[in-house]
C-alpha cells in the first residue's frame, strides 16, 4: 500500500506540474512604423591602390530620414584574414591626403565587413543630403597604416549605384 500511495502521489505531482497552461504567442511579423527596409542610398567604388594588393569593394551610404541618420556600410573583397583594417573618410580627392573627416569601425579582414556593426551611424541629419557635394574620399588601411584601397566619394565621383 505504501508503494502505491507513493506512486499515486508522484503521478499527481507530475500531472500538477506539467498541466500548467502556457500561452503560445504568435510572432509579430510586421515592421514597426518607420522601420523596415532602407531604400535610399548612394554607393561608391573602393579600388586597390597598389599592385601588391587587390582589395576592392564598395561603400554604401544609406539614408534613414525618420531618424535623421546616415548608415555607412563597407564591403570589401580579398582582405587579409587575420587583420583589422582601419577605415577613414578624408577631406579632398584621392591623393590629397588632407585631414581625416572621421573614422568608422575597422573592417574585419575575415569577413570584409565592418567589425562592430553592419553599419556605422552618422547622426548629423544633414550628412546624406550634402553627400553629393562632399569633397572627400575613403581610405582602407592595413595594420601598419599603409593604404590598401581607396575610393572617391561625393563631388569627386559619381555613385556607381543609387536610389
Residue ranges with predicted function:
Residues 15-19:
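C-terminal motif of bacterial Sec signal peptides marking the signal peptidase cleavage site
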Residues 1-9:
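Bacterial N-terminal signal peptides that target proteins for export
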Amino acid at each position: 500500500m505504501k508503494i502505491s500511495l507513493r506512486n499515486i502521489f508522484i503521478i499527481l505531482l507530475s500531472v500538477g506540474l506539467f498541466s500548467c497552461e502556457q500561452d503560445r504567442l504568435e510572432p509579430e511579423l510586421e515592421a514597426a512604423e518607420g522601420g523596415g527596409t532602407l531604400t535610399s542610398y548612394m554607393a561608391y567604388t573602393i579600388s586597390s591602390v597598389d599592385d601588391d594588393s587587390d582589395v576592392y569593394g564598395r561603400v554604401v551610404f544609406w539614408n534613414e530620414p525618420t531618424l535623421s541618420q546616415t548608415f555607412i556600410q563597407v564591403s570589401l573583397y580579398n582582405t587579409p584574414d587575420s587583420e583589422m583594417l582601419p577605415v577613414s573618410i578624408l577631406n579632398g580627392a584621392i591623393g590629397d591626403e588632407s585631414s581625416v573627416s572621421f573614422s568608422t569601425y575597422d573592417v574585419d579582414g575575415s569577413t570584409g565587413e565592418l567589425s562592430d556593426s553592419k553599419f556605422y551611424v552618422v547622426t548629423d541629419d544633414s550628412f546624406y543630403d550634402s553627400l553629393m557635394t562632399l569633397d572627400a574620399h575613403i581610405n582602407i588601411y592595413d595594420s601598419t597604416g599603409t593604404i590598401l584601397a581607396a575610393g572617391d566619394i561625393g563631388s569627386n565621383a559619381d555613385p556607381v549605384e543609387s536610389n
